[in-house]
Amino acid sequence: MTKNQAGVMTSATAGLNLSDSVYERLLRERIIFLGTQVDDDIANKLCAQILLLSAEDPTRDISLYINSPGGSVTAGMAIYDTMQFAECDIRTVGMGLAASMGQFLLTAGTKGKRYALPHARIMMHQPSAGIGGSAADIAIMAEQFAHTKRELNELQALHTGKSVEQVTADADRDRWFTAQEALEYGFIDHVISHANQANGIGG
C-alpha cells in the first residue's frame, strides 16, 4: 500500500469505528440488524433505514436480522407499522434470541419470508406494565394496558394463523420455542442453516 492510498483510507474511515463500517456495508446490501433491546433510539434508526431502502428500490426485499430480548412496546410498534408501510417485502431472520417484541417483529415479516437459524430461541409473552400513581391514573393505565395486550394478541393471531383465544392463553406466561417449534406454531416459515436456503437473503 502506498502512502497516498493509506491517506485515502484514513480519510474515508475517519470518525467510523469497525462496527459502524460493518453496519453501513450491510445497509448497502439491504440488510438491517436489530441486535439490542428495542427502545426509541433503535426504533427510529430501523424505521429510517426501512424507509430509505424502500424508497431506493421498492421491488427488492429488505432483510431484517433479529437477536433481541425485546423492549418497549411503543417503539416496537413503530418498527412494526413501518414494516407494514414499506412497499417492499421484509424478510426476517431470527438468530440467537428473539423474545417478546423481538419475537413479534420476527413474526411480522412478509409471509413466506420469515426465517430462523437452527439454534435460535423464540419467546412469546404478554406485555408487562409498571402501573403506579393515583387511583385515577392506575385505572387509565390499566385500560391502556388491556388495549395494548388485546391489540398485540390480535396481530399475533393474524400473522400466525392461530386464534386470538389460543394466542391469549399461550402468551399469558413466558412461552419458549425452539426454531422448529416456532415453525410449527406459525411464527416463522422456514428453519435455515445456510444463507442460500433463504433464496437470496439480502435482496
From Swiss-Prot:
Highest taxon, organism lineage? Bacteria
- Where would you find this protein in the cell? Cytoplasm
In Gene Ontology terms, what is one molecular function of this protein? Answer: ATPase binding
Q: Name one GO cellular component term.
A: cytoplasm
Q: Does the keyword Membrane apply?
A: no
Cite the active-site annotation: 100, 125
Task: Return any one Pfam family short name.
Answer: CLP_protease
User: What are the disulfide bonds?
Assistant: none
List the GO biological process terms: protein quality control for misfolded or incompletely synthesized proteins
Primary localization class, coarse: cytoplasm
EC number annotated for this UniProt entry: 3.4.21.92
Q: Which SUPFAM superfamilies match?
A: ClpP/crotonase
The UniProt family comment states:
Belongs to the peptidase S14 family.
Function, as annotated, reads: Cleaves peptides in various proteins in a process that requires ATP hydrolysis. Has a chymotrypsin-like activity. Plays a major role in the degradation of misfolded proteins.
Protein name in the entry: ATP-dependent Clp protease proteolytic subunit 2
Q: What is the taxonomic lineage of the source species?
A: Bacteria, Bacillati, Actinomycetota, Actinomycetes, Mycobacteriales
